[in-house]
Amino acid sequence: MKFFIDTANLNEIREAQELGILDGVTTNPSLMAKEGISGKDNVFKHYKAICDIVDGDVSAEVIATDYKGIIEEGEELITIDPKIVVKVPMIKDGIKAIKYFSQKGIRTNCTLVFSAGQALLAAKAGATYVSPFIGRLDDISQDGMELIAQIVGIYRNYDYQTEVLAASVRHTMHLINCAEVGADVVTCPLNVITGLLNHPLTDSGLAKFLADHKKVNG
């Protein structure tokens, strides 16, 4: 399973990259705004800065919601760096644009996916990634993890090459459950990735080893 970090914060991206397990980055307009990045030139420079840090794919989201606008924005975004993946919303014109991009060899991430039917359309259109949102489904008392399992199963049935990129991952159990059902990628905040490091028995065991070492060696 690939690990992507869901942030536009350069320090967090560097920290995840330094762990040696980072496979990519996902961003969105909200994350850019959180970092105070505004204006097309600044946004593009920030994407380039992200690409300079990581070795893997960087999802950059279009703002347009019409077919022509999505195409224009996507074709601009890919000029930033070969690592850029165009993030396209799950809407009618988005699906049409994903098909266009697929035919042109431009990689895409279909975002805001909340049903297996939407994921099926994205795969049929040739999306590189599809991003189902686990946490947001959980927020409305629907089972986000069940959706991930459904999509993984459907894609395996038909040998679709679209990768299931689980998004809106809120905690480590979300991440572990995604691994259990076979998600190809998980994108999450830095604290979820680093949360995998922690276990009280690891801490107590290490403390005992160090204490015993001190007793023996003074």
Swiss-Prot record:
What GO annotations for molecular function exist for this entry?
aldehyde-lyase activity; transaldolase activity
What reaction is this protein's catalytic activity?
D-sedoheptulose 7-phosphate + D-glyceraldehyde 3-phosphate = D-erythrose 4-phosphate + beta-D-fructose 6-phosphate
Does this entry carry the keyword Signal? no
An annotated GO cellular component of this protein is: cytoplasm
* Gene Ontology biological process terms from the UniProt entry: carbohydrate metabolic process; pentose-phosphate shunt
Question: What is the annotated localization of this protein?
Answer: Cytoplasm
Biochemical pathway: Carbohydrate degradation; pentose phosphate pathway; D-glyceraldehyde 3-phosphate and beta-D-fructose 6-phosphate from D-ribose 5-phosphate and D-xylulose 5-phosphate (non-oxidative stage): step 2/3
What residues form the catalytic site here?
K87 (schiff-base intermediate with substrate)
- One family from Pfam that matches here is TAL_FSA
Query: Which keywords annotate this record?
Result: Cytoplasm, Pentose shunt, Schiff base, Transferase
What's the Enzyme Commission number for this chain? 2.2.1.2
User: What does this chain do?
Assistant: Transaldolase is important for the balance of metabolites in the pentose-phosphate pathway.
PANTHER family on file: FRUCTOSE-6-PHOSPHATE ALDOLASE 1-RELATED, TRANSALDOLASE
Stated name of the protein: Probable transaldolase
Organism lineage? Bacteria, Pseudomonadati, Bacteroidota, Cytophagia, Cytophagales
What gene is this protein translated from? Answer: tal
